[in-house]
Amino acid sequence: MTRVKRGNVARKRRKKILKLAKGYRGSHSRLFRIANQQVMKALRNAYRDRRKRKRDFRRLWIARINAATRQHGVSYSKFMGQLKRADIQLNRKMLAQLAATDPDSFSKIVELAGKA
């Protein structure tokens, strides 16, 4: 069997992990085993939270739209139903932005949806 030397490979692998762990506190950025655990955890959290961020923003937009529509005497669910019937194709992100930055145009949209 031929001899396999893999010192460079191991060093490269460890340096890669320590580079990813840069900025972590204490031994989490210095010791390979602990740094490796922290990097794995960080990557796991990042993966999970990229998906969670989409849900969180949707909840935020819904809360903002609900607050704005209730000022006009309509609940969120009724408003969304009216929008569908009126065939107004604005997504929740746009509606929330309008409600926050341009209340006048948002009130016009509420009126238009209410007529349908």
Curated annotation (Swiss-Prot):
Short name of one Pfam family: Ribosomal_L20
Gene Ontology biological-process annotations: ribosomal large subunit assembly; translation
PROSITE patterns: RIBOSOMAL_L20
Gene Ontology molecular function terms on file: rRNA binding; structural constituent of ribosome
Matches recorded under InterPro entries: Ribosomal_bL20, RIBOSOMAL_L20_CS, Ribosomal_protein_bL20_C
Swiss-Prot/TrEMBL keywords: Ribonucleoprotein, Ribosomal protein, RNA-binding, rRNA-binding
GO cellular component: ribonucleoprotein complex; ribosome
Domain of life according to the entry: Bacteria
HAMAP family, alphabetized: Ribosomal_bL20
Function: Binds directly to 23S ribosomal RNA and is necessary for the in vitro assembly process of the 50S ribosomal subunit. It is not involved in the protein synthesizing functions of that subunit.
Family: Belongs to the bacterial ribosomal protein bL20 family.
Protein name, as recorded: Large ribosomal subunit protein bL20
